[in-house]
Design a protein with these regions (language model features):
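ATP/NTP-dependent adenylation/nucleotidyl-transfer catalytic domains that generate, transfer
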Residues: 43-45, 54-57, 71, 78-79, ...
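CN hydrolase (nitrilase-like) catalytic-core segments centered on the catalytic cysteine
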Residues: 2-89
């Protein structure tokens, strides 16, 4: 049956207020809670529920004064039942989000066109009021890491599901392409490590010899001992065909051919290395009857942090919809659940304990493309987050821009409160502006990215979820950010 609240939503209501008189019996509160959240999710609305309190007649029934505020299936606030003093339950409902979610739901649009009875309702239009100014705080709290669940158990479940989706996608593509080998470049960083783990899991799933995973390390001008040793360790312990192809001489020959001074460490200096590595991987794939498995992640795709037709290109990109802040959790899940603990797979690698230590060291290594020479102590000089900003900020911006459709002013307001005590407001504003600048400017790379599995609600595939012109103009977004006062 269509509930009264559903009818109201079909006729334009965004927030339903239900003053109820629901008595209490054992287990009824759980059912009521589920019902409220289900109604708010199904009707894409805010739902405010309140019930009669303990001072109602108790002749046969007892009332608890249960109050619930829900938004699109998510609990915003809830009181303690059976309170004997008057209380107020309050919370922030995101009206803009409700409007955005409804704009994406075609079935709701169809139902609205069929089942509206506008003549049965009285419409009272209220001019929107500015309830909060920039100096006031939200009651509601937003997770600083929206791609990662708050509790450990859910994190483990989510990581396992992501890993299985990646594995299933790669398995199907290997079979469809009749590929004999999977070729993957290993840098000793997080993304290539996850890609190699996905390859290893896929070959176990298909019953194939892991020696048909051709793992290639290609030391260059910025490679450090730490990443080099970790790369060799994980490749060897996973049983892959380990190959080492130094790129220094080839890149120097290329510099000479195009007349580039190798002492000038500019974008040409960096991108020549990335494209040389991609060429090596592609040629090995041709030679062995396989294809190249891409390693880039969702955050890099959003920021365009890749070399066009370099690491930007592969035959199948297994990490393409996994954000950077989540990559380390998936790698950590493999380390702690496949290589140790009660669910350890004893024959997962040649030495589970050593592989696990290497994975944890990779998780602790600064994020870097290692295209610039290390310092005199052999440490990484080129750190990605110093160049483009913290990934925890960019993933926050990405999630709420794509998934919630937040405009710049609103996103800045929420981000500054969410990261209060971690980053200064001016710092958040600086990197939000950079996020918009890069996101728009780098769409041309996303317009031609390889296939890869969607693992979550936020993805940037140009073939499905994100169709954006390569020359879209960012001026309005940047202007709104620039006009925001701190």
């Amino acid at each position: 049956p269509i509930t009264p609240g559903a009818r109201l939503c079909l006729n334009g209501a965004h927030i339903i207020v239900n003053p109820s008189a629901s008595d209490e019996t054992v287990g009824k509160a759980d059912y009521r809670r589920q019902l409220v959240h289900q109604q708010s999710a199904a009707n894409i609305c805010g739902y405010v529920y309140t019930s009669s309190g303990v001072y109602e007649s108790t002749t046969d029934l007892v009332y608890s004064g249960h109050c619930i505020i829900s938004e699109y299936g998510t609990r915003i606030a809830e009181n303690d039942r059976f309170e004997r003093e008057s209380t107020i339950t309050y919370g922030d409902i995101d009206y803009e989000r409700i409007k955005f979610e409804r704009s994406l739901d075609h079935s709701l649009e169809e139902c609205t066109s069929r089942y509206t009875d506008r003549e049965l309702y009285t419409y009272v239009y209220i001019d929107p009021l500015r309830v909060l100014n920039s100096e006031e705080k939200l009651i509601r709290r937003f997770a600083p890491n929206p791609f990662v669940p708050a509790d450990r158990r859910t994190v483990d479940e989510r990581c396992e599901e992501i890993f299985r989706i990646q594995t299933a996608g790669l398995a199907k593509r290997l079979e469809h392409a009749r590929a004999k080998t999977a070729v993957v470049g290993i840098s000793g960083g997080l993304d290539s490590t996850l890609a190699l783990l996905v390859c290893a899991e896929t070959f176990k799933l298909l019953g194939r010899d892991p020696e048909n995973i051709i793992a290639v390390t290609m030391p260059g001008f910025g490679t450090t001992d730490r990443t080099y040793e970790n790369a060799l360790t994980i490749m060897r312990l996973l049983g892959a065909d380990v190959r080492e192809v130094p790129i220094g001489d080839a890149v120097m020959a290329h510099f000479e051919a195009i007349g580039h001074d190798p002492s000038v460490h500019d974008v040409t200096y960096e991108n020549c290395q990335a494209r040389e590595r991609t060429q090596i991987l592609m040629d090995i794939a041709n030679e062995t009857g396989g294809f190249v498995v891409g390693t880039g992640d969702l955050s890099e795709s959003a920021l365009g942090w890749s070399t066009y037709n370099g690491d930007h290109m592969s035959m199948y990109a297994v990490n393409v919809s996994v954000p950077k802040t989540l990559v380390s959790f998936v790698v950590g899940w493999v380390a702690d659940n496949r290589l140790a603990g009660e669910h350890e797979v004893k024959d997962y690698s040649l030495d589970n304990a050593t592989l696990r230590r290497a994975l944890h060291d990779i998780m602790d290594t600064p994020i870097s493309p290692e295209l610039l020479p290390p310092d005199k102590d052999g440490k990484i000089v080129q750190k990605t987050e110093e160049r483009v900003g913290p990934y925890i900020l960019h993933d926050f911006f990405l999630f709420y821009t794509i998934r919630f459709g937040m405009r710049p002013r609103r996103l800045l307001y929420i981000a500054q409160q969410t990261f209060e005590g971690m980053f200064e407001p001016s710092y958040v504003k600086k990197w939000l502006r950079e996020f918009y600048r890069r996101f728009f400017m780098q769409q041309y790379k996303r317009s031609c990215i390889p296939d890869g599995p969607k693992v979550g609600t936020v993805t940037l595939s140009p073939r499905g979820d994100w169709r954006m012109p390569s020359d879209a103009d960012s001026s309005l977004w940047l202007k709104e950010i620039d006009e925001c006062e701190l």
